[in-house]
Amino acid sequence: MVMTDPIADFLTRIRNANQAKHEVLEVPASNIKKGIAEILKREGFVKNVEVIEDDKQGIIRVFLKYGQNGERVITNLKRISKPGLRVYSKREDIPKVLNGLGIAIISTSEGLLTDKEARQKNVGGEVIAYVW
């Protein structure tokens, strides 16, 4: 089966595992998925990220994070720029997610950045997803 949007698939797998309260999620690796997973780790949405190398493309193991009473840290993830409709943002128009409570993941010339990092570096780019 040919996958037309591997990023949407990755976000959907995280959303589904989070809803089912799974501890660990494994997905096929790619550079952009590694970047998104690292941003989620850096921003405190997931506990840890491991990249398992094999002879093929590799696997990303994501350890999901929950609060003390089992409440979800990730409320939702939303794919913004899709293969059929790309969404770009100038550096002046970088979106804020829930007035700063969430993050926007943006693909820039500096690599994958959050909305705050893109504003600090004064760069725009393709808005990949919102996470809150």
Curated annotation (Swiss-Prot):
Q: Which InterPro entries match?
A: Ribosomal_uS8, Ribosomal_uS8_CS, Ribosomal_uS8_sf
Homology family: Belongs to the universal ribosomal protein uS8 family.
Q: Which cysteines are joined by disulfide bonds?
A: none
Organism phylogeny? Bacteria, Bacillati, Bacillota, Bacilli, Lactobacillales
Q: What is this protein's name?
A: Small ribosomal subunit protein uS8
Per its UniProt record, what HAMAP family does this chain match? Ribosomal_uS8_B (MF_01302_B)
Q: How does it assemble?
A: Part of the 30S ribosomal subunit. Contacts proteins S5 and S12.
Taxonomic superkingdom:
Bacteria
What NCBIfam families does the database record attribute to this sequence? Answer: PRK00136.1
**GO terms under biological process:** translation
Signal peptide residues are none
One Gene Ontology CC term in the entry: ribonucleoprotein complex
Q: What GO annotations for molecular function exist for this entry?
A: rRNA binding; structural constituent of ribosome
Role summary: One of the primary rRNA binding proteins, it binds directly to 16S rRNA central domain where it helps coordinate assembly of the platform of the 30S subunit.
Kindly state which keywords UniProt assigns to this record, in alphabetical order: Ribonucleoprotein, Ribosomal protein, RNA-binding, rRNA-binding
